[in-house]
Amino acid sequence: MSDKIKPSEVSEVLQQQLQEVNGSQQFDEVGTVLTVSDGVARIYGLRNAEANELLEFENGTMAIVMNLEEDNVGCVLLGPTAGIKEGQSVKRTHRIASIRVNDNFLGRVVNPLGQAIDGLGDIDLTGAFEMPLDRKAPGVIYRQPVKEPLQTGLKAVDSMIPIGRGQRELIIGDRQTGKTAIAVDTIIVSATAADPAAMQYYAPFAGAAIGEYFRDRGYSALVVYDDLSKQAVAYREVSLILRRPSGREAYPGDVFYLHSRLLERAARINDQQEVAEQMNDLPECLKGKVKGGGSLTALPIIETQAGDVSAYIPTNVISITDGQIFLETDLFNQGFRPAINVGISVSRVGGSAQIKSMKKVAGTLKIDMAQYRELEAFSKFSSDMDAVTAMTLDRGRKNDQLLVQPQYRPMPVGEQVAILYCGVHGLMHDVPMDKVRDCQDQFLDAMRSQHADVIETLADGKLTDDCIAVIKDTMANVAGQYKA
């Protein structure tokens, strides 16, 4: 028997078996849950955990590190607390909180983790970029001035409070005044009131990260934060549970920094490719793939209480943004929609974000409307007035009617210029007040069918003498039908 067994054969078999053994070992840094309550957990044992790092619990729930303390780590849960108990293990992922993004996100509804919640199935993440939720804003060198208009299709906004690409324009007002209706976009990062506070807190950051993915690849993106008041409340809730020091109205001391670092990420990137490629705090996945000239425009929304714009969070965001659109309950109830208070609404970018034809036509519209409001207030105390005052009031009331616009019915900029020219220059003075909107619709129908070339010229920014003559003739024909 011993003659049949050869040492060389035994060694070959042993070597073959040893080769099949996987000698590589994976070490995970694991901690233990000390306490869990109200969407916040404290973990013992993760000494090397980093701020904003993702942690994974036994049941697959993810969490983000927010507090680094002497003997434990405080983290916020990105899922339900059910199933998480004291003594369970938690491991580090060695990944800073991020979201995987690609072009397949267009037209989808996702949560702050990038998971689809619109019932249309999972999103194909082939070739996705890992975009950090929290990222430093581009430095001044990598930006360029806001000079390209972002057409909203709303006459009141495009004419008097123009928004440019790369701008941050606040939409502020009480509940139910039409704030969301002004700004609606396609990719929605949703965290509802029923979601954990951490999901509500991180939803705007996820939206900014998706916007930056498109901006840094040379596209123009728009992000709408609806609304930052709720995010501040969610941040306050999380911070108080983590026992962070509280300040005014029990908000944490860094609530201003929370909103400023989020909104400063909106920018128009420098057109020069070599400059854009050197952008600060660029994620690894974007290095070598950045294209200049992209923009990220932010429209944050803030809900006020009884029109109080001097409260803590509203004043913070007003001071950060490049202007605000203030919506008033009284105007909304009177039927003026969008219910924009022209007097205290402003765009600090101004005419540089308007095409030339709109700038020429609407240059005095805001002042005219402010003077009309003042005159209207005084006219209530006086029965007789001179002809000039009566004409100013009539023109102002008709312009008010022209600026009213049905919900989700944007108007092309060429048509806006044409109808606003008629209003500003008093071409509708013979039209009865209750027929102004009918006259507007008939005028625009005539322009579309007979003078489409003029509308195109106006949209290109050219207000020529020929265009003005066509506008005057068309309005004269239409207005003549409404003479009393």
Residue ranges of predicted features:
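Phosphate-interacting basic helix/loop segments used at nucleotide- and nucleic-acid interfaces
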Residues: 13-24, 153-157, 207, 262, ...
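Conserved catalytic/coupling modules of large nucleotide/cofactor-utilizing molecular machines
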Residues: 213-216, 230, 237-484
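The conserved Walker
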Residues: 175
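N-terminal accessory targeting/assembly segments
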Residues: 1-108, 112-117
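P-loop NTPase nucleotide-binding/switch module
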Residues: 88-90, 97, 101-104, 117-168, ...
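Phosphate-binding/switch loop-helix module in NTP-utilizing enzymes
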Residues: 160, 200-235, 286-288
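Residue-level signature of catalytic and energy-coupling elements of molecular machines
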Residues: 33, 87, 109, 163, ...
